[in-house]
Amino acid sequence: MPKYGFHQSTELINGRLAMLAFILSLFIEFITEQKILHFLKFL
C-alpha cells in the first residue's frame, strides 16, 4: 500500500480513461465539426 497517492491499479485505470476520453473527444470533433478542442486551444 503506497504511503502517498493512489494505488497502482487506480493510476492505470485513470490513465486509460483519460486516453479514452481524449480519443472520444477527437472523434466527436471530427464527426460534428464543431472544433471544440481548437476553441479550447488543445489542438
From Swiss-Prot:
SUPFAM superfamilies recorded: Chlorophyll a-b binding protein
InterPro entries: Chloroa_b-bind (IPR022796)
Primary localization class, coarse: plastid
Keyword match Chloroplast: yes
GO cellular component: chloroplast
GO molecular function, one term: chlorophyll binding
Keywords assigned by UniProt, alphabetized: Chlorophyll, Chloroplast, Chromophore, Plastid
Locations listed in the record: Plastid, Chloroplast
Role played: Possible role in chlorophyll and/or carotenoid binding.
Family: Belongs to the ELIP/psbS family.
The protein, known as: Uncharacterized protein Ycf17
Organism whose genome encodes this protein: Cyanidium caldarium
